[in-house]
Amino acid sequence: MTIIRKKHPLIKIINHSFIDLPAPSNISSWWNFGSLLGLCLIIQILTGLFLAMHYTSDTATAFSSVTHICRDVNYGWLIRYVHANGASMFFICLFLHVGRGIYYGSYNMIETWNMGIILLFAVMATAFMGYVLPWGQMSFWGATVITNLLSAIPYIGTTLVEWIWGGFSVDKATLTRFFAFHFIMPFIITALVLVHLLFLHETGSNNPSGLNSDADKIPFHPYYTIKDFLGALLLLMALMILVLFFPDILGDPDNYTPANPLNTPPHIKPGWYFLFVYAILRSIPNKLGGVLALILSILVLALMTFLHTSKQRGLTFRPITQTMYWILVSDLLILTWIGGQPVEYPFIIIGKVASIAYFTIIVILMPIAGMIENNILDLD
C-alpha cells in the first residue's frame, strides 16, 4: 500500500497534499476552517445537484418548483434546507478563515492570500445568484437592486445592466442565466481551491507563533486528519441543528411570497452574509461612490500585505494591534446589524461612522500600531 501511495502518479499527489504533508506541530483549531470550507463546498455541490434535478429556471414555475421540492420530493425539504443553511455555514467558516488569516499574518503569503480573495469574490457571486433562484419577493428585488448598481459605471453602465438582464428588467432571461452560472460556479470554485492549495503547499502553513516551523514538522495524517474529522463532526452537528430546528432563522420571510414586480417590499436586503458590504454601500450617498466602497471593502484585504509594518508576523504578542483587530471585528458586527435596518435615523449615521471606522482601522490604525509596537519592543 505504501508503495502505491508514494509511487502512483495520481495517488502520490493526494499523498503529498493530505497524508505525508509536513505540517507545523502547533497549529490550533483556527486552522480547521480550511478543511471545513472544503466540506461545505462538497455539501453544497451535492445538495445543489439534487435540487437542480427538480428545479425549473422559468419565472412562471421557479417558485412552484421549489414548493414542489419541499412538499413532494422524498426528503426534498431536507435537501433544500441543507443547501440554504449550508451557504450560511459556508460564510461563517469563510469569515472565520479570513479573520484567522488577518490575526496571524497569513496575508504575508501573497499568492495564497490573493487567491483567497478571488475565491471570496467567487463565493459571494455564487451565493447572490443562488439567492435569486427561488424567485420570491426578496429574490426578485434583491436581483433588481444589486444588478442595477452596475448602471453607476460611466458610459457603459446602462447597456451593461440590460445585457446582464437580457432585457429591460429582471425577467425570465435573467433567471435562466443566473441558474446556469450558479450551477457552473461551484466547479470553477473547486478549481480555484486547488490553485489556493497549490500556492499554500509552496510555502507551507503559517502557525500561531508566526515563526518558521521547518525544524518541527509532523505528518498531516493521522494528527490533523483526526483533528479535521472532529471539526467536520461539529460543523455537521451545528448544520443539522440549524436545518432541523431553525431552518428559516437566517432566511427572509418575504421570500415565501412569489416575486411581484408591481409590489416592492418595505425593506430590500440581501442574505445576512452580505449585510456588512450592503451597509457600506448604503452609507455613501453617491451611487458610483457606494459601488466603489462595496468593492473596496473586500479588495482592501489585498492591501494588508503592503500595510504590514510590524517586525512580528501575527498579533499573538502585539496588544495594541490586537485591540485594533477586535474593534474591527466589533465594527463588522455593527455593519452587519445596520445592513438589516431601514434607511432612517439613527441607523444612517451609525452606518456612516462604522464604514469610516472599517477602512480607517485597516488602512491607517493597524499599520501605525505596528510601528508603535516596533518602537516599544525596540525592534528597529
Curated annotation (Swiss-Prot):
SUPFAM superfamilies: a domain/subunit of cytochrome bc1 complex (Ubiquinol-cytochrome c reductase), Transmembrane di-heme cytochromes. GO terms for cellular component: mitochondrial inner membrane; respiratory chain complex III. Binds 2 heme b groups non-covalently. Disulfide bonds: none annotated. InterPro entries: Cyt_b/b6_C (IPR005798), Cyt_b/b6_C_sf (IPR036150), Cyt_b/b6_N (IPR005797), Cytb/b6-like_sf (IPR027387), Cytochrome_b (IPR030689), Cytochrome_b_C_euk/bac (IPR048260), Cytochrome_b_N_euk/bac (IPR048259), Di-haem_cyt_TM (IPR016174). A ubiquinone binds at residue 201. PROSITE patterns: CYTB_CTER (PS51003), CYTB_NTER (PS51002). The chain crosses the membrane at residues 33-53, 77-98, 113-133, 178-198, 226-246, 288-308, 320-340, 347-367. Heme b b566 binds at residues 97, 196. It is a multi-pass membrane protein. Signal peptide: none annotated. One of its GO terms (biological process) is mitochondrial electron transport, ubiquinol to cytochrome c. It comes from the Eukaryota. Keywords: Electron transport, Heme, Iron, Membrane, Metal-binding, Mitochondrion, Mitochondrion inner membrane, Respiratory chain, Transmembrane, Transmembrane helix, Transport, Ubiquinone. GO terms for molecular function: metal ion binding; ubiquinol-cytochrome-c reductase activity. It is found in: Mitochondrion inner membrane. The keyword Membrane applies. The cytochrome bc1 complex contains 11 subunits: 3 respiratory subunits (MT-CYB, CYC1 and UQCRFS1), 2 core proteins (UQCRC1 and UQCRC2) and 6 low-molecular weight proteins (UQCRH/QCR6, UQCRB/QCR7, UQCRQ/QCR8, UQCR10/QCR9, UQCR11/QCR10 and a cleavage product of UQCRFS1). This cytochrome bc1 complex then forms a dimer. Belongs to the cytochrome b family. This is Cytochrome b. It comes from Dicrostonyx torquatus.
